């Protein structure tokens, strides 16, 4: 924080300011100079290392003060009246945030001392408790004779390859990787000391009663919540579009799942769970069809969906008749920092009488933290001792302290006006990108990409899905139930019309995503004719423009019918003899024809309309696997057989068949959908779908694991 911004209305600095700058620079500070209010604000938006703002009387007023506060309400601001300035001070125009210094009364050294003390106070204020304690510990440079064995990186420096590794990451990474033996830093497992302060700080930031830092991802956070909330022998309501970590919970614990069935549209975009699925009548009916099921004690709902659809969570919290609800919100840790998400989150609002609400966040996914950083938030009466046992069961006794600090810093970054600005900038950038795609489409001489969104996106808000709208492609939409997040942008490629019907020609989206990947642009998810991109706080204008440029480049190459070798070099290298002289339009039409052959839109609806039959719960199926009571079966032959592993294609990574389930004639469209994915990969090298739980054989066929008859 050595950068200082000086705002002065005169291009030519007076002798006093020149002298002050010289004194500051001798103290190691770098001075940025702005000559008007807009330039001051531009500097502040683009240089987060500015530790203080100095303004002369001729440039400062109350309006500028309010604009600075809106950007960063913690930043120290000084109004200087230089010794060579005779302008009288209008204290009514100064504002309440800034500190006035009449430089006639102080030496340069005194003024610099005031500025430096303010910067130190600013740094102290914005640094959260655990991170502050960790920084202080590293500064002390203590000698240790405990773990970790690299001893602040010293061990790496004794080896050539270790030195390369050390130099790549830098010394503070290793100095801050320390043992749990350091009592002054408390304990993550015991939630004591600075670790406890960090979790209390995070809870305050996210409007929770309790928050827990999880250092091995939301996959683990989900299991911790489930192990606490659902005792063995109980029944749990669970979103069928759940993350596979929740399937792993079902495999670990002997509990009975009853599935809440969401919708999908012709694009394969995951829809929400209809309101009727949450009613007592429908839940009661479900229980009669599941052997051993009792009234559920807990519910798990994915919010938002992978594709960015939020629920009206206030209504679900008030009406769903269970003791606790877990909103798996791994993909939306930013929702507490913009009013557009009010009423659509787990931690929003007050406690719900006689219920405990859990919300899990993948801090690393769309905030700024190291990979695997996650949080559990709780609202309601929690047995903290029992929860702590479930937490310790899944938490390492040697947590990586830099990851703990990054989780806390991610929360700190979102506090106050700075966090609101980060969030607003992301929202504005996402909506601007959406509009740019629509503008290009409107002016295109032939085809162009489209965006999955309402016609009018002028207002930055979560757009409600209405039954009368056609754009979303879902059937039977409930009023005031589902909302689209502006941050998650789904691009559409040609191939499906607005009614969800297949067109004669098409450009399957995996061609585009592979093209983008060859150019260093990685998308989040690719469906048959859709691509999901995320406008997180780390996306800037340069990245957004790079994506737009790459999309335009693909269109140009496609329209010119360039060779596959030119457009998709890595795909070409998968099988040069197959792709020799093949053109991109031929490849696109080939994959599109296979999709048409299987009538994908109808297959999508059918495959997720009837679930497989649960013969045993996932826990029992996994126990049989551990005992070796399973065997291989070709994928196409699995009708009528009990599946041993979960089967899920990537994308989207949502289980289609759970352990212990059987595909019947009624649910056979699920198998047909999987076979279609396999057929595309068999026909076109480089386009194989990764199907977890199905194993590709040398002959190109797939095998799955089934329970022995």
Tell what function each PLM region has.
Residues 4, 12-28, 35-55, 68-76, ...:
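Non-catalytic terminal extensions of PLP-dependent enzymes
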Residues 78-83, 326-329:
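ADP-ribose/adenylate-binding Rossmann-like module
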Residues 24, 34-46, 56, 62-69, ...:
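Conserved PLP-enzyme active-site core in the AAT-like
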Residues 172-220:
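Conserved N-terminal alpha-helix of the aminotransferase class I/II PLP-enzyme fold
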Residues 6-7, 80, 148-150, 239, ...:
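Short hydrophobic segments within beta-strands
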Residues 2-14, 236-239:
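Short hydrophobic beta-strand segments
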Residues 212-214, 299-302, 531-536:
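Short glycine-rich or small-residue beta-strand-to-loop segments that form or flank ligand, phosphate
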